Amino acid sequence: MNNRKLSFALALILSLSAMSCGSGGDVIGGETTTSEGGETTPEVTTPAEINRENAVIGLPELDFKGETINILYAGEKTYAQDVTAEETGDVVDDAVVARNRSVEELLKVKLNPIVFSDNTKETAEHLAKVILAGEDLYDLASVHQSYSKAYVSEGYYHNFANDQYIDFDKPWWNNEYMEEMVVGSERKFFLIGDISLMYLKSLGCIYYNKELYESIYKNPDEPYDLVFDGKWTFEKFDELTRGAYSDLNGDGTVDKADQFGAFGSKNKSVEHFVYGAGIRSTTKNKDGIPELTLYNEKTVSFAELLHKLYYENQGFLIAPNNQFTEELPMFQNGQVLFAPTWLRYADTFRDMKTDYGIVCMPKFLESDEYSTLVHDGTTVFVAPTTSKKTDMIGAVCEAFAFYNYKSVTPAYYEVALKVKYSRDDATAQMLDLIHSSAFTNFGYVYASQLDGLTSVREFVVNGAEDFASWYKSKESAALAGLAEVIETYKGIDG
């Protein structure tokens, strides 16, 4: 282990130990003042905004007498880090190991990670079969969002909404996300936020090659300035992408030997462009029931821009798949300016010889807020209703999320950007912006049940130009699918 990694690991262990010792709850200090009459009164202080430096866990002192918590997870490493790792000298692996030790010491429990399969779909299906059989094999599970959502209507997952140990107001939870995933209110079957490292890896973002940007547009930090000044719009992205194109081989045709501004697929990339621009396909009413709201003036206008990017911008390279097997090396080699992907691809860029930056997905209008769609390949944490340890699972989840927020997330940032996380650093501020704007939408989560309308993929796949006609052709099936999903939720207890 080199000195930098050793220093990080030692600092991490010491900080986690200190956090464990100070787990009696949040304390806001205040000075006392003495009046002329000799009476002392406490001076009222405004609570500081919670951040990664000052956050403390609010759990009471708990002792679960060494109880074992069985946690199911998918064995593929990208997903496994949610639950377990080995000390390898890698800052993220070591942070995960330190987190697990801290959770065990804090709550007096024994964490028992169990892998059934490396495959995320097989893992979700296995969990469902175990619950259906009434077997108490697992207390907690890290499962793929897209593959696990179907089983919530079967009543397989515990509702954490009123858990005595989880404080959903803390920044390590994405409360709105959890509420958006279900029908109704006061239902939290899926836990997500910093508890899931895969959630962080699944945040949509755009990498850019700083050296190439400087050679074309002079200022390599301009994308950061555009974001922070509120001017990072989809039209600006389209403009910069178009301007970056160059016919490198001089053959007069657009081919992969040329220089491009950006790349994207016709499916997953489309979803991140659409939802990142602030489009929402469904909206919850006052009772928490989702209603189809995709068709409006904003969506129609954005669809026109999306079509222009994919079919009228020679600087945009359409990728044949979501793995970007040819396009990622082109970005690394300085042949593509922007790489709209997910944060998880930072691992791929670790050995790039040139510097890269990272910005959020562009918004539609300057007046909009930035939005970061979480890819549905993220993991969510669920507790099987067959577990008899629901009294302690919430405490374990709260501790998991807290320690991730304090240490594992910053460790991943260090890997992602090759710099130590600092609140004063522009890249750290960008990551905080991406993290704080993370969301999902019910229509996105259940797009397959809504005839694919709410993913907007087919609009781009078919090369359609008239969004209104395309929408009308799918609206009836989407409404029927939405009604069916809503109906299935009515039979769920909790």
Spans of features found by a protein language model:
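Conserved N-terminal structural module of periplasmic/extracytoplasmic solute-binding proteins
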Residues: 2-154, 407, 464-494
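Periplasmic solute-binding protein
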Residues: 152-155, 175-224, 263-286, 376-382
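Short, solvent-exposed loop/beta-turn-alpha elements that line the ligand-binding surface or hinge
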Residues: 166-173, 227-229, 255, 279-299, ...
